Amino acid sequence: MGRRKSKRKPPPKRKAIEPLDQQFNCPFCNHEKSCEVKMDRAKNTAMIQCTVCLEDFHTTTNVLSEPIDVYNDWVDACESAN
């Protein structure tokens, strides 16, 4: 007599990786997606600037830095100033 075939569960579906945002809300004028980050990896610097109120912020970066890190540094600097 032969064995019964075992029913295997299908492999789990992988979740799609969502890319991180490149544009952010301005903490000064509260416009949505008005701040754009420009990163210069050669000089290890980054600048974020609002296209509406023209506020900007410069910071140093490292190899692992992403635009969201620059935005968080800007928000932290705003909170520490107040």
From Swiss-Prot:
Recorded superkingdom: Eukaryota
Keywords (A to Z) from UniProt: Metal-binding, Nucleus, Transcription, Transcription regulation, Zinc, Zinc-finger
A GO cellular-component term linked to this record: transcription elongation factor complex
One Gene Ontology MF term: zinc ion binding
Residues binding Zn(2+), per UniProt: 26, 29, 50, 53
InterPro entries: Elf1, T_Elf1_sf
Location within or outside the cell: Nucleus
Pfam family, one: Zn_ribbon_Elf1
Record has Amino-acid biosynthesis as a keyword: no
An individual GO BP term: transcription elongation by RNA polymerase II
Known function: Transcription elongation factor implicated in the maintenance of proper chromatin structure in actively transcribed regions.
Family: Belongs to the ELOF1 family.
Protein name: Transcription elongation factor 1 homolog
Species of the source: Manduca sexta
